[in-house]
Amino acid sequence: MTTNTVTLQTAHIVSLGDIEEAKASIKPFIRRTPLIKSMYLSQSITKGNVFLKLENMQFTGSFKFRGASNKINHLTDEQKEKGIIAASAGNHAQGVALTAKLLGIDATIVMPETAPQAKQQATKGYGAKVILKGKNFNETRLYMEELAKENGMTIVHPYDDKFVMAGQGTIGLEILDDIWNVNTVIVPVGGGGLIAGIATALKSFNPSIHIIGVQSENVHGMAESFYKRDLTEHRVDSTIADGCDVKVPGEQTYEVVKHLVDEFILVTEEEIEHAMKDLMQRAKIITEGAGALPTAAILSGKINNKWLEDKNVVALVSGGNVDLTRVSGVIEHGLNIADTSKGVVG
């Protein structure tokens, strides 16, 4: 079965047409993020041409703003009038809050009681009402669903939604605009909305593009589902890639991923830290753990070199919302192992 046939099979979930419509819908809101070449990853590590897609420079510091703005922009006037609600402790919260502010919609964000103060304040700064409820995300989500039902508010899901996936897929269109002959694209994965959208965009134009998902060894529900060919949960511990800390992937995103993604790479916590440090040190890029996953996969040597050598490769830096205390810890840890670390990016 060809990939073109498969993209038709998954079109009922999200299609190239949906992504092209999203591109027009969110153009007034988003920033077209830069694509820069990493000379070190290209010349010294892969012998290919490796480019970094900098979604850490997106408004709110994350790709999540794309999907949130597309979803909210497609709501009916009645839905907008009743307000929107989301459960999130991170990037999705800020994407929803900023979009609501720009469109003049009331937004409520329910966060776990343990949500970092910095993220609470950032979300409030965009004008959203923040409610702290629940000792874990599941409790937070359940409370959010109760509030939505009681008040008739529309839930904005962080990944398992057609419009959200389409919004994230606009990154794929930008990649093709910049490098029409791209061969390999490496994407961080949590719930799967990002890679589902990007894979749909890329494979619709060129089925031979090799798409690699990257997850932490500690949390990789989508990778587990992909290889077992069944929706599966996986979480053995927390991860520094907290933006991808999703135990069970989305049902819709999984359906797209299982058809359009080619493989998954799992990286260790230490490999993620190394990538964060190297991106800061050599490329002057501040990234959160999730945003460093693709670079970690390249530096780890776990990707078959046939997808890298003499190839045009894009590694997505998905976001840069990282606490300064975590940045400090990564730098300190990096200095402690400097004698044995050889990876640099630039």
UniProtKB/Swiss-Prot annotation:
Which cofactor(s) does the record list? Answer: pyridoxal 5'-phosphate
Q: Which UniProt keywords apply?
A: Allosteric enzyme, Lyase, Nucleotide-binding, Pyridoxal phosphate
Enzyme Commission number(s) from the entry: 4.3.1.19
Q: Which InterPro entries match?
A: Ser/Thr_Dehydratase, Ser/Thr_deHydtase_PyrdxlP-BS, Thr_deHydtase_catblc, TrpB-like_PALP, TrpB-like_PALP_sf
**Protein activity control:** Each protein molecule can bind up to four molecules of AMP, which act as an allosteric activator to the enzyme.
Residue positions where N6-(pyridoxal phosphate)lysine is found in the record: K64
Q: Which PROSITE patterns match?
A: DEHYDRATASE_SER_THR
Q: Where is AMP bound in this sequence? A: F59, T60, Q94, G125, Y126, N321
Q: Which reaction does it catalyse?
A: L-threonine = 2-oxobutanoate + NH4(+)
Pathway(s) per entry: Amino-acid degradation; L-threonine degradation via propanoate pathway; propanoate from L-threonine: step 1/4
Q: Tell me which domain of life the UniProt entry assigns to the organism this sequence originates from.
A: Bacteria
What is the main EC category here? lyase
Instruction: List, alphabetically, the CDD domains matched.
Output: Thr-dehyd (cd01562)
**Recorded GO MF terms:** L-serine ammonia-lyase activity; nucleotide binding; pyridoxal phosphate binding; threonine deaminase activity
Q: Signal peptide span per the entry? A: none
The family line of this record is:
Belongs to the serine/threonine dehydratase family.
Task: Please describe the quaternary structure of this protein.
Answer: In the native structure, TdcB is in a dimeric form, whereas in the TdcB-AMP complex, it exists in a tetrameric form (dimer of dimers).
Described by its record, this protein's role is as follows:
Catalyzes the anaerobic formation of alpha-ketobutyrate and ammonia from threonine in a two-step reaction. The first step involved a dehydration of threonine and a production of enamine intermediates (aminocrotonate), which tautomerizes to its imine form (iminobutyrate). Both intermediates are unstable and short-lived. The second step is the nonenzymatic hydrolysis of the enamine/imine intermediates to form 2-ketobutyrate and free ammonia. In the low water environment of the cell, the second step is accelerated by RidA.
Q: What is this protein called?
A: L-threonine dehydratase catabolic TdcB
Organism for this UniProt entry? Staphylococcus aureus (strain USA300)
Name of the coding gene: tdcB
